[in-house]
Amino acid sequence: MEKRDYYEVLGLTKSATKDEIKKAYRKLSKQYHPDLNKEPGADEKFKEIAEAYEVLSDDQKKARYDQFGHEDPNAGFGGGFGGGGFGGFEDIFSSFFGGGGRRQDPNAPRKGDDLQYRMNIKFEEAIFGKETEIEIPKDETCETCHGSGAKPGTQPETCSTCNGAGQINQAVDTPFGRMMNRRSCTTCHGTGKIIKEKCSTCRGEGKVQKRKKIKVSIPAGVDDGQQIRVSGQGEPGINGGPAGDLYIMFRVQGHNDFERDGDDIYFELKLTFPQAALGDEIEVPTVHGKVKLRIPAGTQSGAQFRLKDKGVKNVHGYGMGNQYVTVKVMTPEKLTEKQKQLLREFAEISGDIPEEQGSSLFDKIKKKFQGE
């Protein structure tokens, strides 16, 4: 199935600002988070939203996406030009303009590929950090042959077709005349080596797949979509090169009571009419424990109070965020007759007598004649 446009996924246009992208992601990820939304397809929708945000929130990835769309030749780890169909023309123009010196030695040590792992963590784990362990499938250098791919006691031989270069030259007729085109050697598949007696453990691959446990330190203050690098825990290096790195991207679960925006926490405090009108002192929950908050008399619905340093520790060490408490005054749905009478008396004193629902036509006519 064809991928949807990332801007369309987040309900945005290409002119959207970073702040708009972030807000759209937070809204949609909360709406479709698998822990909060059990509808069929919510999980796939959440993954689509996360993928769109991962690209559009990164300036470099966004710039490439805006230019190439989903056909970005540099997308993903280890990506880049140089696949099947364009290799010939690249070599032709490289030779024509004098770029022939860029050929790589297939036997030179090369760094292994990077790996990416998405890790789901709880709201509190993201705020306070945690030491944990993950288990991932990854390739490891074969311990039997030490990565050579050859049976112990033997060595790979130099390919006689390409003399160990891993590439062969081929004459190609072009509009510029006959030119030499380099192609991967089909005998050794570009490795420059021939393994006559393969290692029985890895079957000549030089590596085996294992499930490896890796210790991970979740940094305090990490936010949804951020990632950390675990050096040397990617795929094994080639020809004795260093291993790649493991990038762990965090997906933070939502919370029933709190909402996070950067280093700040938001909490909705429900008050009764008497509490808002007369004032009160209330215990308010925070991620750090309960604190007392004084509600001044006459507080209106929508009023906001700041609890300094009761938010999230900045992941880069730039201080603490705050918690913002937003008031919501609740209107009682069921009243006793005594409560209704007291409210009527209050309304009379205030000079604002409401036309109550449920009054009979006779009562309304009676009040009219009585001048009420």
Swiss-Prot record:
One of its GO terms (cellular component) is cytoplasm. Its main location: cytoplasm. Zn(2+) 1 binds at residues 142, 145, 199, 202. It is found in: Cytoplasm. Keywords: Chaperone, Cytoplasm, DNA replication, Metal-binding, Repeat, Stress response, Zinc, Zinc-finger. A zinc finger (CR-type) spans 129-211. GO terms for biological process: chaperone cofactor-dependent protein refolding; DNA replication; protein refolding; response to heat. Disulfide bonds: none annotated. Zn(2+) 2 binds at residues 159, 162, 185, 188. Residues 5-69 form the J domain. It comes from the Bacteria. HAMAP family: DnaJ. NCBIfam families: DnaJ_bact, PRK10767.1, PRK14276.1, PRK14280.1. Participates actively in the response to hyperosmotic and heat shock by preventing the aggregation of stress-denatured proteins and by disaggregating proteins, also in an autonomous, DnaK-independent fashion. Unfolded proteins bind initially to DnaJ; upon interaction with the DnaJ-bound protein, DnaK hydrolyzes its bound ATP, resulting in the formation of a stable complex. GrpE releases ADP from DnaK; ATP binding to DnaK triggers the release of the substrate protein, thus completing the reaction cycle. Belongs to the DnaJ family. This is Chaperone protein DnaJ. The lineage of its organism: Bacteria, Bacillati, Bacillota, Bacilli, Bacillales. The gene is dnaJ.
